[in-house]
């Protein structure tokens, strides 16, 4: 006997009376297993890989990277979700793909219920590609990728002291080819 209360297992054991008054399902000859977690997927952010309008896995035309949230492109009604659920997968860890940077963006964790609120942990991790394609985006070698990653961490550590100390908040640093905002101080000749 297995008793579920509010979506969680409350009792497992031989006492059938524990389920008295509850909806019962005869599991004779059936398997009962814990839900499977798919630890690296793109389920819900791509419907048809070759069709750009249904593919939110990467943003190759932007200089944003770590700020990108894969959850902003999540479709809980994607056709891949019920198929995945039928196979016993109850949770998916969804990672973005790298586009113009080895830092692809922020991934999330979702259940496979198909409900609008199925994202259980948004911004769960930052996906960084340190493999061959990430190395290519960072300058052509893994040492270049590691140097870029160390630089990104140094920028993140130094950001509060550099930009919050003056409490201005309107300077947007960019280590890309195209700065997103420039601010000139008082008395600037430009």
Predicted regions and their residues:
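Histidine-rich, glycine-flanked metal-binding segment
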Residues: 1-33
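Short, glycine-/Ser/Thr-/acidic-enriched flexible segments
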Residues: 9, 17, 31, 42-44, ...
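Glycine-rich loops and low-complexity Gly/Arg-rich segments
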Residues: 9-11, 29, 49-51, 60-64, ...
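Protease-associated
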Residues: 16, 22, 33, 43, ...
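Residue-level signal for pocket-adjacent positions within structured domains
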Residues: 20, 27, 59, 63, ...
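Short secondary-structure boundary/hinge segments and terminal tails
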Residues: 20, 54, 101-103
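Metal-associated gating/positioning segment near the N- to mid-region
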Residues: 30-87, 92-95
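Polyanionic/metal-chelating signatures
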Residues: 74-80, 85-190
